[in-house]
Amino acid sequence: MRHLPYPLLGLFLALSSTGAALAGEQYYPLDKGSAPYAVAPNAQGAVWYGADGGHSLGRLDPTSGESVQVALGEGARPRAIVSDESGNAWVLDSGLNAILRVGGERLGSERFPLPAKAAPAGLESAVFDDDGRLWFTGSRGFHGRLDPARRLVEVWPSPQGKAANGICVTPDGEVWYAQDDALVHVDPLDGSAERLPAPEGTKALRGIGADSIGRLWASDSGGARLYRYDPSDASWQSWPLPDSQARPDSLRVDAMDRVW
């Protein structure tokens, strides 16, 4: 069995299966029925969370333990949250089929609906590029881009109409997302996409992240494996997870190139 060149830390999976506890862990009670889902810390130290049960977005102050909720509208289902450098939250809402911006200070909200041709898109994941544009995916077979400066939302069908899952931007500005048994490369100029099949046996690529030299890491939630693709030489490598029953979903690569 080959060892991972970077630590793969299935921390929360391990905790849920063993009952172990984190040293110094702290719990924050929320309003009854909040049903928190997506979570995103912002640069100012607050934590945004999707209160799926209340059709709202919450903001928690970990220092005081106080939280407030911002109503997103009837039928809202916040699926993913990204925080920008100013501390604002950008919410992918699958129920409203829209992206919402919630201000980090005054908590005012602004809605950017998706074009009618992408209804419902099944909004899934999002990431900012270096130009401040928000790239996003939809599980119903779409990828798109929101340019806040132009207030423009563009959407394109994913290759073969398959679900578009996790999305990332490499250090050199390339946009990639996971699509079950493939990775998809998006042209940042016109939104066109090229599908790159993963090795045979890959079942369900979900999370994706890029390291400091542009290699792509992806989790296979159907095969309990971690994959790495190097665009520089088109090479693939994969490693089995310690638990063959694991179903890895989200994936992040931190500033030290550690895969979580």
Residue ranges and their predicted role:
Residues 28-55:
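Beta-strand-rich domains and repeat architectures in extracellular enzymes and scaffolds
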Residues 28-32, 71-74, 113-118, 157-160, ...:
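Surface loop/turn motifs at the tips and blade-to-blade linkers of beta-strand repeat domains
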Residues 35, 77, 95, 121-122, ...:
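Beta-rich catalytic cores
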Residues 41-44, 83-86, 128-131, 169-172, ...:
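Residue-level detector of Asp-centered blade-edge/turn motifs that repeat once per structural unit
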Residues 48-53, 89-96, 134-140, 175-181, ...:
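Conserved beta-strand positions in repeat-built beta-propeller and related beta-rich domains
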Residues 56-58, 97-101, 142-144, 182-184, ...:
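A short loop-to-beta-strand structural motif that recurs across blades of beta-propeller domains
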Residues 61-65, 103-107, 147-151, 187-191, ...:
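Short loop/turn segments that connect beta-strands within beta-propeller blades
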